[in-house]
Amino acid sequence: LRILFIAPAPRAGTVQYTHNLANALVDRGHRVTLVTGVGFELADYPRKYTALEVFDRYRPRPLRLCRFVWHCLTFRPQIIHLQGAQHPALYILLWAMLRLLGSASFVYTPQDVLPNSLRSYHIRAFRFLYARMRHVFLNAKQNEPLVIEHFAVPRDRITVLPIADLTAFVREHVAGESPDIPAASRVVLCFGLIEPRKGIHTLLSAAPEVLRQVPDALLLIVGKPLMDIAPLQRQLADLGLQGRVRLVPQYVSFAQMAGYFTAARLLVLPYENGWNSGVLASAFGFGKPVIATRVGGFDEVVSDESTGLLVPPKDPAVLAQAIVRLLRDDALYARMVVNVRQAAAEISWETIARMTEARYGDVVGIGADCAVSQAR
C-alpha cells in the first residue's frame, strides 16, 4: 500500500509513535510518507520512509505546502492516516483539500481523545472529523466507549492497538547524557509534558513521606510545561524539598532522556485523568517498573504487583507508600524488572504494523494480505 501519515507536531510522543509505525510498515513492504512540522526531531535518525516538513505554527510556508501537494499528486496515497488530537480544524482542512486530489481512504489515530486545551468548537469539529474517517485506531480500551459516546463512531470501525516502546531508537543510536545525580541516590522519575492532569502536585505532596522513609531518594520531575508552574515551585519551596526534589521544566534532548531513564530506579505517573502514555511504554523499554494511577488505560499495561504498582489518583498517602515500597523492597523490585523486560518484548512495532495493515486492507477492500503487491 501507499500510505501517507500526517502528524503536524514535529516533536514528542505522537510523531515518535508515527516514526516507529512508519518504519515497521516499510519493513512489511509498504511505501510510506510522513508529513510533519518544521523542525522534525527525528530528522537525523535512521528511517525507511519519506519525511516532509510542511507545517509551521509561526508562519506560512507556501513553498513547502506546494511540495506537499505535488507529492500527494505523484505518490497517490491509498491510505491517509491522521495522527494526534491537538489540531482538529487543521485535520478538517486537510481532509477537504486532500480528498480532491485523489481517492485515498482516511483513517485516524487520535492518541489523546481530546486536546490538551479544549476549546468550545472542538467537540463539533471532532464529530465532523470522525464521521469522515473510514477507521479509527485507539491506544487504550477505556477510550473506546468515550469515542463511541461522544463522536458516534460505530464499534466495528474501531481497533485498539497497544503502544510499543516509542524511543527504542534512543538506546540504539544515542549515547545517554548522565544527569548530575549523587551516586547513592535512588531516583524516582516523573517524565513527560507537565500539565494539570498529570497530578504533579499530588507527587509533591507525597514527597515528604517518601523522603522521610527513604532518605537517599531523589525525585526528578522532567518535562516541558504546558501550564503555569509557579504553583508547583511554590509548593516545592513551602515543603522545603529543594535539592531532594528537582523540577526540570524543559523539553529535553533524546540524549538527556536516555540519561534520566537509565539513572531512574522507577517511573511514577500520578495522572488524574488521561488517554494513554508513551512514557509508560518507554519506561518498559528501559526495563523500569512503573507506579501509575488507575486512569488513562494504565491498568491495561501495568500489571499490579508484577510490572509495577497501581494506585488511586489524587491520593498522596497511598502514592507515597507505593514509592517507598519499590524503593525499599529490593526482592520485589528485582522481580518486577524481569517482568517488565518480558512485557516489553511481547509488544513490538512489527505486531502493531501487522494489526494496522490488516485494517488498512479492510478499508481499501483488498484484505489483510496487502503488503508489497499493492505498494507499487
Where are the regions a protein language model picked out?
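Conserved donor-binding/catalytic core segment of Leloir-type glycosyltransferases
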Residues: I6, D180-K198, L204-A207, L220
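Acidic anion/phosphate-binding donor-loop and adjacent secondary structure
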Residues: H30, I148-E149, P162-I181, G259, ...
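Nucleotide-activated donor-binding/catalytic signature segment of Leloir-type glycosyltransferases, i.e.
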Residues: L232-Y251, A255
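Acidic donor-binding loop of glycosyltransferase active sites
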Residues: G259-W275, K288
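Conserved acidic donor-binding segment of nucleotide-sugar-dependent glycosyltransferases
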Residues: D304-E305, L309-P316, R325-A331
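A short, well-ordered alpha-helix in the C-terminal region of glycosyltransferases
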Residues: V318, R325, L332-E346, M355-A358
